[in-house]
Design a protein with these regions (language model features):
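Short glycine/threonine-rich loop-to-helix capping motif typified by GTGT followed
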Residues: 59-67, 255-263, 332-356, 364-373, ...
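Conserved active-site "lid/cap" helical segment
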Residues: 1-90, 98, 158-166, 187-188, ...
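Condensing-enzyme catalytic core mediating Claisen C-C bond formation in acyl metabolism
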Residues: 1-24, 137, 171, 202-312, ...
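Conserved catalytic cysteine-centered active-site region
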Residues: 1, 56-114, 118-150, 188-214, ...
């Protein structure tokens, strides 16, 4: 496999509705941003780019079949090769990794990955119905299943087994909204308190409206390349491009229905799901105690796909201790509860300790005043962009939005793009992006690193 670099990215402004632009025009907004950051015109880029990968979640939201080819044509990239990917909420993350594969395999030297969603064409209730179609339509959907209900069920089990509290979940919401306050591309730039989150309208107990991501219109685009492609881009732009290398990718899957997921024995958990930083006598004993008391993995409250994706990505990137070796994470926080669950499955803390980790301060930015009394200093900021909860969740763009913000963090250009360096992770050298579908059916994890 060849080295792969993520050299540029652009995003549109995320909003509840963007009636000013069609979905191809939103993609062009992000595409133009990415090219401008490279110092290239469309004509120059067209001579260099080999093809693209497109990402959008739902034909229903787009109100258009084959919407990706319309965006490809609008960008002026025909007849270059392209294909569309779809994987629920993980669609953008899959798109990024498909572009990586095109470069790593030698099929392309320069590949554009772009994604979009326009969710404002329908009322929120209808949008929730469309999203619910990404569950089992033979069993779950007909009896009124919807995603906020699924996640409420998962977190109540997590609360029962591990003592996780609604206040710990609210810490995630406060953190992500306060981060988004400093992100000019974010949809919800609000300053919140724990009380604000808990007193918001209840959607599905214990999840309030401020525990849940928002529907959005938006687009994002990234440019990935090989060493040869990088040389072509630099020659055309006449400038050196800061190197950000994609050093690891991982994916995982699980059954659509949570009840269909097997409960692993202690030995099988150690064999298949133990992360590298967990292979210590102390942590093995901790897990043995959980199993002795009747706990199982993944249960209905954990994401085995996320653990598998993390394990694969860490293996490729040579990461032994994610909390110590990763400088920031852009994580798929569709719900505050799912961010807590994902802390555990990415190895930022142990299985069952996500709630305490959320309220500890370790996932917070050191440069933001959250108005909270936090016991620990920041260790690995999670969702410095504001995440899905506050920055927005235009599904097909979301995983690519994470990649764009990660690229800017590692190029140390957050201050340039945001006109405010509050959210710049100091001396960031390595970041992770995490994209998640369904109740953990598809998950991607990618590791990006600054290369001098």
């Amino acid at each position: 496999m060849r080295p792969v670099y993520a050299v540029s990215g652009g995003v549109s402004k995320f909003a509840k509705a963007r009636p000013d632009k069609t979905f191809p025009a939103l993609v062009k907004e992000a595409y133009d941003y990415a090219l401008d950051d490279l110092g290239l015109t469309h004509r120059q880029f067209l001579e260099i780019v080999d093809g693209s990968v497109a990402s959008y979640f739902s034909d229903h939201f787009a109100r258009q079949l084959m919407a990706a080819i319309m965006a490809q044509d609008y960008l002026g990239l025909c007849p270059k090769p392209s294909h569309r990917v779809e994987g629920g909420g993980a669609t953008g993350g899959i798109c990024f990794q498909e572009a990586w594969k095109a470069i790593a395999s030698g099929y392309m030297d320069v590949c554009l990955a772009y994604g979009f969603e326009t969710m404002s064409h329908v009322a929120t209730w209808k949008g929730n119905e469309f999203i619910a179609l990404a569950s089992d339509v033979s069993t779950d959907y007909p009896v009124g299943g919807f995603y906020s209900g699924y996640y409420a069920m998962m977190v109540t089990r997590h609360m029962k087994e591990f003592g996780t509290t609604p206040e710990q979940m609210a810490h995630v919401s406060v953190k992500n909204h306060m981060n988004a306050y400093h992100n000019p591309y974010a949809q919800k730039r609000q300053k919140l308190s724990i009380a604000d989150v808990r007193n918001a309208p209840m959607v599905a107990w214990p999840l309030t409206r401020l525990d849940i991501c928002v529907m959005s219109d938006g687009a994002a685009a990234t440019v990935l390349c090989s060493e040869e492609g990088l040389a072509k881009l630099e020659k055309a732009s006449g400038q050196r491009i800061p190197r950000v290398r994609v050093t690891g990718i991982g994916r995982g899957t699980d059954a659509m229905r949570m009840a269909d997921r097997p409960h692993q024995s202690y030995d099988d958990f150690l064999k298949y799901n133990l992360l590298p930083n967990e292979d210590t006598p102390e942590t093995r004993a901790y897990y043995q105690d959980l199993w002795d008391r009747g706990f199982r993995y993944p249960g209905i409250h954990s994401f085995r796909a996320g653990r598998m994706g993390s394990k694969e990505a860490y293996k490729h990137a040579g990461i032994a201790d994610p909390l110590a070796e990763i400088d920031f994470v852009e994580l798929h926080d569709a719900y505050t509860s799912s961010e807590i669950q994902t802390y555990e499955d990415m190895g930022l803390c142990r299985y069952g300790e996500g709630g305490a980790f959320a309220a500890s301060g370790k996932a917070f930015m050191p440069s933001v005043d959250y108005g909270l009394d936090l016991a620990d200093k920041p260790a690995c900021p999670v969702n410095p962009s504001g995440g899905l909860i506050a920055c927005g969740h235009p599904v097909g763009a979301t995983g690519l939005m994470q990649a764009v913000f990660a690229i800017w963090q590692l190029q140390h250009t957050i201050g340039k793009h945001f006109e405010d360096d509050t959210l710049q992770v100091s001396n960031a050298k390595r970041g992770a992006i995490h994209s998640h579908a369904g109740t953990g059916t598809y998950v991607t994890v990618s590791i990006l690193e600054k290369e001098d």
